């Protein structure tokens, strides 16, 4: 069962994106390089609680 997770910018801590993740097959935290509209640049976004 896929759960909805939130991705937060590592620089400004804004929560910009939501996505789904299967926690049984991928127990580690996700990290993507995505565009942050508050920083106005591409930054790493990590999964938050």
UniProtKB/Swiss-Prot annotation:
CC annotations in GO: cytoplasm; ribonucleoprotein complex; ribosome
Gene Ontology MF, one: structural constituent of ribosome
Covalent S-S links between cysteines: none
Gene3D superfamilies, A to Z: Ribosomal protein L33
InterPro entries xref list: Ribosomal_bL33, Ribosomal_bL33_CS, Ribosomal_bL33_sf, Ribosomal_zn-bd
Alphabetical UniProt keywords: Ribonucleoprotein, Ribosomal protein
Zinc in keyword set: no
One Pfam family here: Ribosomal_L33
A biological-process GO annotation: translation
UniProt-listed PANTHER family: 50S RIBOSOMAL PROTEIN L33, CHLOROPLASTIC, LARGE RIBOSOMAL SUBUNIT PROTEIN BL33C
Similarity-based family: Belongs to the bacterial ribosomal protein bL33 family.
Protein name stated in the entry: Large ribosomal subunit protein bL33
Organism of this sequence: Syntrophotalea carbinolica (strain DSM 2380 / NBRC 103641 / GraBd1)
